[in-house]
Amino acid sequence: IYSPQQITGVSGIDLGDNLFTVSSKDTLNKLKAKLPFIETVKFKRILPDTLKVTVSDAEKYACYKSGDKYYTVSSQGWVLEETSEPSENVFLIISKSAELTVGKAVRYKNENEKQKTQEIIKYLNAQKISIDYIDVSDDIDLKAGVEGRFIAEFGTDSYLEAKIKHLKSMTETIEEGKSGQI
């Protein structure tokens, strides 16, 4: 996605810098702030005077809605871009406490909401249920759009894993073409 010149220019690493004082964490943060579609950065020091930097591209994973904007994030939780329309081929996360800034990790004002989001995603993925959206904006009305045809209403997060296992069995037994709320 980015050229070697872009990466080198933003990294803050200059010719002649001491190989052992270059901070991989600082460099990663600089790169992600300016070039958000970078997922990881690996360093290989080749003595006496070479530092090889390898980056991997971030892929769009999910999309948060905040006001009238959409924020696409990677699977690692880094905000990749801000758009006026949701990205295609990713699921939507509806949250009232997510703080979203391009080039930074998603932050939650409410740690409980973050945990619920992660659990729902984990359990749905474990059951291989296709996610359309997740709504964690109300503690007692958690829900998800799944399989392109169902709205699963979980209520609270009590017994969430069991509820999602039951959801899997229901989606497998309901005939194709039928949709609704579960």
What are these regions (language model features)?
Residues 6-18, 25-34, 39-182:
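Charged, solvent-exposed interaction patches on well-folded alpha/beta domains
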